[in-house]
């Protein structure tokens, strides 16, 4: 007997009692396991190591951390379902090591700077700080501008919570969801304890922006027109992206995240309108996307075609 939807609901309810979970991701992990039950003709909690790795390989994960999180869900789920069905089985997921999981990471995708919306969501789920999650999300949505000033000088006053829009001095307007709105509010208010070197004292860093400074800093670099302030804030974002890349084992750049976001919007546009890629690029909607992602040339259509047509072949 394979796993059914009611059993998944029961497990999610039980699993959520003992830990904070992101239900959509946990459910997706379980649903993928159910798909492979039909392939291997057995319940997922009876999968062998080789079968589990084949399932994980189908995820095309860019980070071993993401696979470890999936495996953690299935490890607990396998215990729960085996107990429920009174089965004594060897829990493959208990023995799954980081080394084994690293073998099924999609290396080609990992090296690419272009990430899907699913990749971005998985990355965010592996980030502990609201600041880092907000930086990744905002870059993906097209917030940037010259020297990333739109991002680094962003504050809560720009967020229209009722209409779910973020407004910028540059005239840019970014629609957001309730979830992203809550994330931004959390990130603006977030404080951290951080050491700026191996021998440096741990300091509290805070600020009303995504940019944070030590609480005892002489300046918060808040002058939008001051070159040094802009540069310090820009370096702050680049340093955060470097640390995220190092921690998760992926390549993250501000340009790569913005290109990923633009491609995602282009793909949605083509799907929703039924137009070909080249036809869609010449629509008013595509022009607005180009401006949103700081492609302000009159040749924006040709620039987009040259950069992204390979993804629509």
Question: Language-model segments: what does each one mean?
Answer:
Residues 29-30, 120, 128-133, 234, ...:
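Short, leucine-enriched amphipathic alpha-helices that occur as contiguous helical runs
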Residues 117-145:
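Basic, Lys/Arg- and aromatic-enriched nucleic-acid-binding interface segment
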Residues 137-163:
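Short, charged phosphate-coordinating catalytic segments
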Residues 61, 122-127, 154-160:
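Solenoid-like repeat scaffolds
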Residues 102-120, 170-182:
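DNA breakage-rejoining catalytic core of tyrosine-based enzymes
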Residues 10-105:
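N-terminal core-binding DNA-recognition domain of tyrosine recombinases/integrases
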Residues 238-304, 309-313:
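Short, basic (Lys/Arg/His-rich) helix/loop patches that form interaction surfaces
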Residues 168-223:
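Basic, alpha-helical nucleic-acid-contacting "clamp/cap" segments
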């Amino acid at each position: 007997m394979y796993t059914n939807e009611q059993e998944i609901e029961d497990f999610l309810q039980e699993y959520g009692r003992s830990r904070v979970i992101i239900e959509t991701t946990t459910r997706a992990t379980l649903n993928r396991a159910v798909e492979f039950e039909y392939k291997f003709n057995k319940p997922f909690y009876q999968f062998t190591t080789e079968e589990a790795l084949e399932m994980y390989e189908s995820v095309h994960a860019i980070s071993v951390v993401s696979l470890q999180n999936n495996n953690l869900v299935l490890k607990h789920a396998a215990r729960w379902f085996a107990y429920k069905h009174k089965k004594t089985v060897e829990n493959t997921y208990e023995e799954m090591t980081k080394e084994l999981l690293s073998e099924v990471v999609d290396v080609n995708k990992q090296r690419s700077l272009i990430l899907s919306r699913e990749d971005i969501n998985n990355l965010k789920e592996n980030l502990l700080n609201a600041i880092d999650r907000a930086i990744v999300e905002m870059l993906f949505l097209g917030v940037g501008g010259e020297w990333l000033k739109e991002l680094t000088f962003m504050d809560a006053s720009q967020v229209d919570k009722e209409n779910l829009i973020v407004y910028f001095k540059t005239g840019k307007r970014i629609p957001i969801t309730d979830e992203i709105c809550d994330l931004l509010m959390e990130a603006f208010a977030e404080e951290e304890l951080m050491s700026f070197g191996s021998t440096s004292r741990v300091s509290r860093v805070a600020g009303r922006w995504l940019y944070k400074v030590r609480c005892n800093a002489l300046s918060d670099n808040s002058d939008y027109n001051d070159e040094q302030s802009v540069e310090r804030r820009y370096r702050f974002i680049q340093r955060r992206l470097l640390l995220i890349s190092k921690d998760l084992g992926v390549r993250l750049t501000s340009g790569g995240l913005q290109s990923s976001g633009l491609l995602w919007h282009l793909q949605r546009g083509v799907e929703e309108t039924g137009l070909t890629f080249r036809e869609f690029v010449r629509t008013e909607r595509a022009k607005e996307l180009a401006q949103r992602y700081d492609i302000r040339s009159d040749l924006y259509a040709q620039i987009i075609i040259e950069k992204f047509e390979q993804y629509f072949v």
